[in-house]
From Swiss-Prot:
RNA chaperone that binds small regulatory RNA (sRNAs) and mRNAs to facilitate mRNA translational regulation in response to envelope stress, environmental stress and changes in metabolite concentrations. Also binds with high specificity to tRNAs. Pfam families: Hfq. This is RNA-binding protein Hfq. Keywords: RNA-binding, Stress response. One of its GO terms (molecular function) is RNA binding. Residues 10-69 form the Sm domain. CDD domains: Hfq (cd01716). Homohexamer.
Length: 81
């Protein structure tokens, strides 16, 4: 995954995790999973509900927070010319 991809995903997922925001995760096959982000790394998200599920990121289509979240904005990377 590119560095820019991580710069977008990590703050978003970390905010969802720290604020215990309920989420709906839609998989590429159309299945909807619901719960809270318990943990994540480069390849998987641990989704906690009545049980904890390990969801591989490559199987995820969309993550929809149950409420509005504010994502912290870091410094914008500059491209070298």
């Amino acid at each position: 995954m590119s560095v820019k991809g991580q710069m977008l995903q990590d703050p978003f997922l970390n905010t969802l995790r720290k604020e215990h925001v309920p989420v709906s995760i839609y998989l590429v096959n159309g299945i909807k999973l619901q719960g809270q982000v318990d943990s994540f790394d480069q390849y998987v998200i641990l989704l906690k509900n009545t049980v904890t599920q390990m969801v591989y990121k490559h199987a995820i289509s969309t993550i929809v927070p149950g409420r509005a979240v504010s994502i912290p904005h870091g410094p914008t990377p500059t491209s070298e010319s």
